[in-house]
Amino acid sequence: MTVIAVFNQKGGVGKTTTAVNLAAALARRGFQTTGIDLDPQAQFGSTVGITAASGDDSIYGLFQRNRPLREMIQKSSSGMGIIPSHVEMSKVDALYGKGYNAINKLNLGLKAENAGSPDQHWVLDCSPVVGVLSLNAIFACDGVIVPMSADYLSIKGAMQIQKTLKALELVLKHRINRRYLLTRFDARRRLSRNVLLMAEKEFGADVCRTLISENVSLAESPLMNKTIFEHSPTSRGAKDYDALMNELIADGFI
C-alpha cells in the first residue's frame, strides 16, 4: 500500500488538479487506485463528476462513525475509485479537536483496508488548513507532494509548509518524505525560471525534475468532469503528469 498526500495552504497552485491527475496516472498504469477528498470544498470528486449524496456517503462517514473506507468508494470513468468529500467535513475540527485519536482516524481506516487489499494505492487531496483533516493525511501518508505555482508568493507558502513538516517530524520521529512540484510553469517567463532556481536552492533534491507547464487543457478538464488523460490525452498537461508519475516511480516515491 502506498499513500500519497497532496498538500498546500495556498489556493490556485494546482493542488486538486495534481491530486486528480496523479491518481488517474496511477490507474492508467494498472494500479488499484483510490483518491480521497479531504477538502470540505469537495473539488476532487466534483472535478470528475462524483459527489456524495450525504455526509455519511463521503469521507465524513469515517470520522463520524468509523465507516469502512470500501463502503464509500465510487468508481470514476477514469478507472480510479473516489471517496468524495462533503460540506459536513467542515465540522470535523470543531467536533473532534486535535488529540491523537482525532488525527489517527484515517491512518487506522487505511490500515484496515490494507489488510484485505495490500496492493491498493491512495492519493489524498488535503484540506488547505493545518487542522484535523490535513494532519490525518500527513500522519497516514508515505509521502507528501507540495504543488506550488511558479510565483514568489507560492514559494513563500511552500517554505512555511516546510517548517510545518519539520515540526511534525519531531512528533512522528522520522523524516516526512516529500516533493515540491512546480506548476503553471512557463519557461519563456523570467519569473518562472527564477522561481525554479529559488525552489532548488531552498528545497534541493526534493524539487521534482518534472515541471507542470501552464496548459489550457488542464483548466478545461474539470469543466468536462474528466481527468486530463480523458479530456486531452495528447496535451502538454497530460504529458507532464505522465512524466511526473514516471519520475516518482523511478525515484521510489511511489
Placement of each model-derived feature along the sequence:
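P-loop NTP-binding core
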Residues: 1-254
